[in-house]
Amino acid sequence: MSFDYINALLKKPTSRTPIWIMRQAGRYLPEYRATRAKAGDFLTLCKSPELACEVTMQPIDRFDLDAAILFSDILTIPDAMGLGLYFMEGEGPKFRNPIKNLKDIKKISTDLNNDLSYVFDGVSTIKKSLNNRVPLIGFSGSPWTLATYMIEGGGRIFASTKKMLFNDPEALHLLLMKLTKSVIAYLNQQIVSGADSVMVFDTWGGVLSEQNYLDFSLYYMAKIVKGVKAQHPNIPITLFSKNGGKYLTHIANTGCDGVGIDWTVELYQVQQEVGNKVAIQGNLDPAVLYATPEVIEREVKKVLSQFKGDTGYIFNLGHGITPDVDPENVKILVDCVHTFSKECR
């Protein structure tokens, strides 16, 4: 099968600009909320291959999207490491057993794939359900981002993580190396189970200084790229560091196929900077989806007009879609991208 999304990542010709949306299976869809209610709680939803398949397919059935993304959570790996993941309504993820010191890190196992079999069963179930309609994206969190959750136990302050970074960097590097080993095995098994491409979400890479970003985040993502490509050289891999616009040249040098960008950088500048090396994914501000259809169309045209050429670009938001967006506006977005991308070529 030839898919525009995969071809764009590999810089092969595409029939139109492909689009998928971060968190496209989510709370903004009434059918998702119904399935979530049926599951009882978020973790049960994630850990049921059948229900994960159901919610993965919902946006594919509703919109003319060019890729599906596995419905799961980036914190499946820390959960399998025994940290006791749970979710508080309105507060996000928490861990019952956060990492406090080197002793805790040394106890962590990296051989997790047996405990994550529900994810791989979900991938194969989704792949079968898709029946080659669109490609399937697998994913993981980056080691740095996973470590922040594991050390903080939740929240977005990062005081404990940065305390370890400055006071005991060797301990943090050990944790990041263990996570890297687990992520490589995790993504490779997703590919074996049917994922057509994979993505690494570095949600909190942008909170680091440049040197710390290179040492504590990108260094390990580069190892992941190498570890995935060693086993699956033809499977494209995308890296996305939120607020990482100033690091794009470094990211493009990892050997990845695509880089995700947010709305704090201009697409045309990114294309000039790294477009000769990697495909680019992004970068509409998610808040545009609160606007009128006319404004959505205007903003889509603004983004599309910045990219020159007929491949190497995937339209997406600059971050995940928000839960209170009107699904009708998502349809307008998707249809606009496909219509106007043909005009812009």
Swiss-Prot record:
<keyword id="KW-0210">Decarboxylase</keyword>
<comment type="pathway">
    <text>Porphyrin-containing compound metabolism; protoporphyrin-IX biosynthesis; coproporphyrinogen-III from 5-aminolevulinate: step 4/4.</text>
</comment>
<feature type="binding site">
    <location>
        <position position="203"/>
    </location>
    <ligand>
        <name>substrate</name>
    </ligand>
</feature>
<keyword id="KW-0627">Porphyrin biosynthesis</keyword>
<dbReference type="InterPro" id="IPR038071">
    <property type="entry name" value="UROD/MetE-like_sf"/>
</dbReference>
<keyword id="KW-0456">Lyase</keyword>
<feature type="binding site">
    <location>
        <position position="319"/>
    </location>
    <ligand>
        <name>substrate</name>
    </ligand>
</feature>
<comment type="subunit">
    <text>Homodimer.</text>
</comment>
<feature type="binding site">
    <location>
        <position position="149"/>
    </location>
    <ligand>
        <name>substrate</name>
    </ligand>
</feature>
<dbReference type="Pfam" id="PF01208">
    <property type="entry name" value="URO-D"/>
</dbReference>
<dbReference type="InterPro" id="IPR000257">
    <property type="entry name" value="Uroporphyrinogen_deCOase"/>
</dbReference>
<protein>
    <recommendedName>
        <fullName>Uroporphyrinogen decarboxylase</fullName>
        <ecNumber>4.1.1.37</ecNumber>
    </recommendedName>
</protein>
<dbReference type="GO" id="GO:0019353">
    <property type="term" value="P:protoporphyrinogen IX biosynthetic process from glutamate"/>
</dbReference>
<comment type="function">
    <text>Catalyzes the decarboxylation of four acetate groups of uroporphyrinogen-III to yield coproporphyrinogen-III.</text>
</comment>
<dbReference type="InterPro" id="IPR006361">
    <property type="entry name" value="Uroporphyrinogen_deCO2ase_HemE"/>
</dbReference>
<dbReference type="GO" id="GO:0005829">
    <property type="term" value="C:cytosol"/>
</dbReference>
<feature type="binding site">
    <location>
        <position position="73"/>
    </location>
    <ligand>
        <name>substrate</name>
    </ligand>
</feature>
<feature type="site" description="Transition state stabilizer">
    <location>
        <position position="73"/>
    </location>
</feature>
<dbReference type="GO" id="GO:0004853">
    <property type="term" value="F:uroporphyrinogen decarboxylase activity"/>
</dbReference>
<comment type="similarity">
    <text>Belongs to the uroporphyrinogen decarboxylase family.</text>
</comment>
<keyword id="KW-0963">Cytoplasm</keyword>
<feature type="binding site">
    <location>
        <begin position="23"/>
        <end position="27"/>
    </location>
    <ligand>
        <name>substrate</name>
    </ligand>
</feature>
